[in-house]
């Protein structure tokens, strides 16, 4: 089955989503800390039993099983994506290495011929010899760099220790606040088709009278054991793209709905990620844009 992933995004206006925005700002630093910690735990021990890690996160940070699961799955997805990117990068480097090696195989014999001719002190041959010698020297340097890079990439894949940073050192040195906002800028809620509204912790309900999606978000951390409405944050939004398709998924429950709240330049956005079967692609393009 060929599955296509779609992502649609809308802005969360504070006037309609104050509870959600306030909760995001309240917990984002703690959430991001857990996220980074989980990344390094899984990176250093990829064979770790995930159910034990999930339980540990619940107990240590007062988060639900679903929130812990969302963090773990997101981290696993990032690591898998990085691994595939590294494999692609290796193929690209190997292609370049092969091209340089073939060129060197052709040029080195020519260099030896020119070296013999240059001994006769022919100025033209001497210039050609020096130019080709310089060219080959630079090509050998490039070849060595490619070999070292390929070895480094293979080592990263074998050890699971990828070179990744959460934010840049340059931004950290220039502006600490901007660095933190860039690094700690999103919360993910991974869904499942089997759950209510295809997501247990973040749910949408479409209200046709106002043409809006009502948001119900389950809160964690110090709110984990709260009862009733104190456990939730509410808001509303509308998606300009794929709105009809999203409403259909909420009815049919034929795709998990994963949500991502992102803070970007002091504005808040909601992304919804869902899947459709490729056999319905033509129908989707026609009916939903």
Model-derived features: where do they sit?
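Nucleic-acid substrate recognition interfaces
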Residues: 1-289
